[in-house]
Amino acid sequence: EDLTLTKNAQPAIMATSIAILKTLEKEGFKIKKSKFVAGHSLGEYTALCASGAISLADAAHILKMRGIFMQEAVSVGVGAMAAILGLNLDNVETLVAEIKDNEICEIANDNEPNQVVLSGHRTAIEKACVKAKSLGAKRAILLPVSAPFHCSLMAPAQENMINLISGLNIEKPIVPLISNVTSIPTQDIEEIRKNLINQITGRVRWRESILFMENSGIQKVYEIG
C-alpha cells in the first residue's frame, strides 16, 4: 500500500527502470550509442539518470519530493484525470475550450493520435468525459490517480520544485534528451533545468516526441520501465 503513494511510487518506478537498464547493459547495450533519450513524465528523470545527467541518489530524492509536492498541491478528491480515446488533439482542444469556465480542464498528456489525457478539477473532468462521448470518443475513462498532474492546479508544486531543481547538480547528458514540454532534444544544462520545472504544470508532448524520433530516422527504440 505504501508503494501506491505518489511520494514512494515515483522513485520506485524510476529505480525499477534503471535496474532494467543495468540488466540490458550487462547484455551489451550501450546508451552512449543511442541517438536520443526520452521519458514520459517522471520517466524524464529516469532518462536523465540513464544518460549521466543526474545521479541515481539525486533522482530518487527529487522524485520523492516531487511526489510529496504534487500530492500536497491539491486536496484529495478535488482534482481528477481522464483518458480520452478515439478523439484527436484538435477535437479534444475544442472540447476543453467548451468545458472550461471557472474550473480547470487542461490537456495533460498528448500521448498518441487517438489518446489524450485531461487533468483539472474533478467536476470539469467529469463533464469533459460526458462531452467527449457525445463527440464520438470510443472511451472516456477517469484514471486512478492521486492528483491532477500536468495542469495549472500543480502550480504550488511547481513553486516548491523551483528551489530543488535550481540546486540540482546536472551534468551534460551523454546523448540529447527529448524534453516533454518542447518535444525537441537538448543537452543544454540550463534548458534541461527550466524544462523540468515547466513540466510540473506543462503538457507532456509525447506524440510529438515520437514523431520527432521518426522524422530523425529512428528505427529501433528500447522501451525501459
For each predicted feature, which ranges?
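Alpha/beta catalytic cores of group-transfer enzymes, especially the acyltransferase/condensing modules
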Residues: 51-203
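Acyltransferase/transacylase module recognition
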Residues: 1-34, 163-224
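FabD-like malonyl-/acyl-CoA
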Residues: 1-92, 143, 220-224
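Long hydrophobic alpha-helices with heptad-repeat/coiled-coil character
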Residues: 117-120, 125, 212-216, 225
